[in-house]
Amino acid sequence: MDFTMSLVAGLIAIGAGIAVGFGAIGSGIGQGIAAGKAFEAMARQPEVRGTVQTFLIIALAFMETLTIYGLVIAFMLLNKMS
């Protein structure tokens, strides 16, 4: 019985790590692409810098929620270990 419980705890810990890792990878890639395209837009048309920057910050905040959701899921999984 002890082996089964430690196996379950280990798999839960791996699942928590995967949840945080994939969430961070996905939002990191998305943020990099969005920032790159925003800088390209600002370089082509400097007069729209304020508008593009505002939309970029809002979009980055939405993308960051993916990482936060992964962290919340990881905490929920780790609480199941107790």
Swiss-Prot record:
Transmembrane segments: 5-25, 55-75
Entries under Gene3D superfamilies matching the protein: F1F0 ATP synthase subunit C
Bilayer topology term: Multi-pass membrane protein
GO molecular function annotation: lipid binding; proton-transporting ATP synthase activity, rotational mechanism
Swiss-Prot/TrEMBL site (Reversibly protonated during proton transport) positions: E64
Compartments it resides in: Cell membrane
Family named by the database record: Belongs to the ATPase C chain family.
Protein name (record): ATP synthase subunit c
Annotated gene: atpE
